[in-house]
Amino acid sequence: MLSCSSFLIFFLFSWVLLPMKSFAIPIISLDKVRLAINDGASEQLPVVIWHGLGDTPTSFTLTEVSQRVQKLTKGAVYAIRVGDNEFEDIKAGYLGKLEDQLDEVCDLIGNEDSLSNGFYALGLSQGGLFLRALAQTCDAAKIRSLITLGSPHSGINTIPGCSPTNLICKAVVHSILGLGIWHSWIQNHVVQAQYYRTEKQYDKYLENNKFLTHLNNEVLHDNYTRNIEKLKELDNLVAVSFERDDIVEPPYSTGFGWINETTGENIEMEDFVLYESLGLKDLVNQGKLETISFPGRHLQMRWGDFDALVLKYFKDEKEEKTELEESTRPSNFLSTYFVSPLVSAIDGTVDYLHGKSLFPEKRNFKELTMRKRSIVTPEDSEEVYPYISEFVAASNVSEEKGPKSFANLAFITIFSHFFYHIDDMWRSTLGLFSLIPQIIGIIYLTVMFTGRELDTFMQFGGQVVNEFINYVVKVSLKYPRPADIEYGVGYGMPSSHSQFMGFFSAYMIAWDYKYRRSQCFSMLSFAKYAIYLTLSTFVCSSRYLLDFHYLTQVVYGYMIGFGVGLFWVYLVGKLRSLGVTKWLLSLPPLQFFYIKDTIPHSKDNHKRQWLESKQFKNQKSN
């Protein structure tokens, strides 16, 4: 799910600035996921996936989830897309009438021959709520088993949250909730308002909400009995919750529960109104309804746990072994002459430091991924999640985080992202520290296109090479991140943020030593170096304290980046002495943009230009 700021932006742009044609019912399609397997000849029932708020079937994470499901089940996988492009699909997650969208999806499923004999369904976040609505209202949707991950079955009592530092977002949401949430236009056009529920205004909810009240049988309506009977047709309904869900409020809604809005106490499913009104009691007695809770945040789970759910509830024929294809590996040249020596050096250094007790926490990364913060291992999972251990053992699926495509890792590495943590100023501040590399990247681009100095372009080129090295090492080592990391973000050794800052610090300090040696021991220079190292400390600390990386991953990321930065200063200096930079400056494209190489050869360049500018102004005034 996206933040409330995104909700407001989509709301304003879609209904105020976009043409009136936006009011039309959007196109809905089923995008079939295809891999290099013969899914057409398989008798395995297909799987239909409906993504969550702010996502699309073509996003990195959804693509990987879809492909993983297909590899595990060896059957066809379809992803529901509302709209004829990604923007329309994201917009439909915020704006539109749910009844219209569900009717369109129902018709589409009815016209898809491969779904006529039934299918399995996987819903992420609000997509799970919509799939349950299909199961209850659409005769064509012959869903066998439905798994919902973090889906607000009982509704939400607040719009998906703002960060604690975004006061404008909070003020606007407060106004919407206080003044307009029950307005007929809001109820017919804002998706989240259609499953908004609060017992503080329960009468208004029952009177004005036409989607969730009917779906959950909280009011009498024509399809009251049909809702109950249609749910009973499911073989399995699996509601997965996340104990620290910071998107769905209250988080107990994902397990058909609620919260006492006065005392804040949890209301279990068995004590909530839906247990009787929706026939959940009968489903429990028949063994068809299972509620499962994982320790993480919203949609945060291990690949192994995800695989176990898919194998148990979506696999027609249980096989003794299901192996996933390995991610794309580096070329033989890189692996032989670069990756292997670097990996050996890292492992050897870890062993040495461990032997010296400098890093007594040397870790079995696989074991840590399964054990940290109550994430159970296959050995003790039988006690906590008995249904999982059987299928983890049977499938032999890796417990590591799933591999990422190069584009995905490049996006995460260079541009990154972090999650706002509602009502947690400390974690939000740490998250902002994680954006320091992105701020430095913007400064790079600004200086390159305003100063047009070749030396700056060379430094930025070194940062890009440094990021590529980070990617190669990550996919070679395949060390997972901590178990608390948000779902599906990739490998963790070494930390790219730390490696970025290591390169930046080393390059800036080494460059001063090489080209400004007479000044590098001045108080001003020491102040600059202190700033570089302080920024690096902020970034590295945030990556560890926010559980994006283990401490060793942060330390080695910084060490690798520092080493690459020192080497890059040497390399650029060597190229300059060999005349390569002079040759580059003679190239027509660089001459066209007036690229120059003056910084290394002139001291006090900025002061000189400032004096020249001042003299020019004085002459002009005279």
Curated annotation (Swiss-Prot):
Cited SUPFAM superfamilies: Acid phosphatase/Vanadium-dependent haloperoxidase, alpha/beta-Hydrolases
Active site (UniProt): S125, D245, H298
Pfam families membership: Palm_thioest (PF02089), PAP2 (PF01569)
Disulfide-bond pairs as recorded: C106-C138
Protein keywords: Disulfide bond, Endoplasmic reticulum, Glycoprotein, Hydrolase, Membrane, Signal, Transmembrane, Transmembrane helix, Vacuole
Intracellular or extracellular location(s): Vacuole; Endoplasmic reticulum membrane
Site (Crucial for post-translational processing): R373
GO molecular function: dolichyldiphosphatase activity; palmitoyl-(protein) hydrolase activity
Superkingdom of source: Eukaryota
Keyword presence, Transport: no
InterPro entries according to UniProt: AB_hydrolase_fold, Dolichyldiphosphatase_PAP2, P_Acid_Pase_2/haloperoxi_sf, P_Acid_Pase_2/haloperoxidase
Topological relation to the membrane, as annotated: Multi-pass membrane protein
Lumenal side stretches: 25-405, 450-488, 541-552
Reported impact of R373A: Abolished cleavage of the linker domain
Signal peptide (from-to): 1-24
Record-listed E.C. numbers: 3.1.2.22, 3.6.1.43
A Gene Ontology BP annotation from the UniProt entry: protein N-linked glycosylation
Ranges annotated as spanning the membrane: 406-426, 429-449, 489-511, 520-540, 553-573
Glycosylation site list: N223, N260, N396
Annotated family: In the N-terminal section; belongs to the palmitoyl-protein thioesterase family. In the C-terminal section; belongs to the dolichyldiphosphatase family.
Protein name stated in the entry: Palmitoyl-protein thioesterase-dolichyl pyrophosphate phosphatase fusion 1
Origin species: Schizosaccharomyces pombe (strain 972 / ATCC 24843) (Fission yeast)
